[in-house]
From Swiss-Prot:
Protein name, per record: Calnexin
Lineage: Eukaryota, Metazoa, Chordata, Craniata, Vertebrata
Signal sequence segment: 1-20
Molecular function in Gene Ontology: calcium ion binding; carbohydrate binding; unfolded protein binding
PROSITE patterns cross-referenced by the UniProt entry: CALRETICULIN_1, CALRETICULIN_2, CALRETICULIN_REPEAT
Any one of the GO CC terms: endoplasmic reticulum
Presence of the UniProt keyword Oxidoreductase in the record: no
Residues exposed to the Cytoplasmic side: 503-592
PTM field: Phosphorylated at Ser-564 by MAPK3/ERK1. Phosphorylation by MAPK3/ERK1 increases its association with ribosomes.
Amino acid sequence: MEGKWLLCMLLVLGTAIVEAHDGHDDDVIDIEDDLDDVIEEVEDSKPDTTAPPSSPKVTYKAPVPTGEVYFADSFDRGTLSGWILSKAKKDDTDDEIAKYDGKWEVDEMKESKLPGDKGLVLMSRAKHHAISAKLNKPFLFDTKPLIVQYEVNFQNGIECGGAYVKLLSKTPELNLDQFHDKTPYTIMFGPDKCGEDYKLHFIFRHKNPKTGIYEEKHAKRPDADLKTYFTDKKTHLYTLILNPDNSFEILVDQSVVNSGNLLNDMTPPVNPSREIEDPEDRKPEDWDERPKIPDPEAVKPDDWDEDAPAKIPDEEATKPEGWLDDEPEYVPDPDAEKPEDWDEDMDGEWEAPQIANPKCESAPGCGVWQRPMIDNPNYKGKWKPPMIDNPSYQGIWKPRKIPNPDFFEDLEPFRMTPFSAIGLELWSMTSDIFFDNFIICADRRIVDDWANDGWGLKKAADGAAEPGVVGQMIEAAEERPWLWVVYILTVALPVFLVILFCCSGKKQTSAMEYKKTDAPQPDVKEEEEEKEEEKDKGDEEEEGEEKLEEKQKSDAEEDGGTVSQEEEDRKPKAEEDEILNRSPRNRKPRRE
């Protein structure tokens, strides 16, 4: 019965899906007509005055630092005040693209959900962009941590380009209107992408204490998958934390994606090796690096035939019956005609194109039959002596180690070059990159408050504007109607099956009910009645025996305690009868 119900349900479900698919367009038209009617009724019932637009669920208020900061800008004043556009040219580049003439503007995001929230927007593509701003005061790397944080939104996605910031080193030569790619920086931090290579840079320039030369040190790549931050067109919060104990953390949206130590997790390492390979050392001419050599005592066997071919004709093969030896595999096309403009003087004698011989279609083959080629069992190839261990093997040669003349040990790489400005020096093939809410300070609490008042509001507004789970499922199904079938099979069908099995099962047999409830059944009652009869009969026999024993006892007392031989014989017989009555063999058979 359950199988029939299930089969019926599947048939009904399949019919409904087909009808829904066939009538999709008609349903859409009917729904649109109904909506038009409802809209007309509502418009007729509305007053003439236009209702004011609904206010956003999240109200924006420009963030304000809650403590001392080295730099903070939310751009909500609507101008580039405090920022300086570069007028420099990039060296070693064609004049057409050497200028830093990329456009910057302060504007809201194209799909802003927070009216009034503005940011710095990189407007142009395929151009060099450079803009910078002075800090309130230079940052000195002493006993306080450094925290850098800002927001990025790739509104159009990103093909190839960066959105990283540079913390420009404090030098007498620093001129922000000449900011370019060679301007000295202390730290570079932020996202960068080209092709399918998604990066989150953290680079600092370390000064060699012996030579005074600066060298870039790159943090290890994050283990997290960064692709979503570049492709989802949402605003993401990037945070760098450097501590005086040389530890660092990189966070995206307030979650750690990379961490480590400046001494252990940078490439190349901050401190060089104590020893290096001697550049003057040379490998001896007789140094043998061969682990295996040909056996010098091996001899080629006399029966080794190096000239035997790898393939030979199969001598056991026979020509298939019906093979057409006299028919060519291809013949001129009889329907082909010489083109009218064919010039035999210029083009030569015209020949019809070749086509497959139609006579060969019904035959196993045409033309000269040849035996197929097979592997030659006697083929051995060119003989080579076997390889043996080289008795003169000395291993792979390496130059000897010597003390590194350039060795130094800097145990406090956190004490970097002070910086006094922040800058964006970028090339991008995608426009409309949105930057917002830059902050540099030494207090994590201040940075978190700034993030909650800025990025936190964006996140809340995005969440309020996004549909719920059901809404997202409906939107996806509207774009891909086949998802309705998936929803039905994964949601409705299991629910129906649960109801079917729980509420419409078959009536159980009486025997099953008996096992569950211990209620007596007809055959069980009869069996119990038989048992009761046997029990009553046994009780009567026991009572009779007891009376007989009492009588015998009284007689024995009257006779002076003697027992006759007859009574002694009767007693074992009564015991035998009792045993036989209790034996299972004497019970009545159970009636089915």
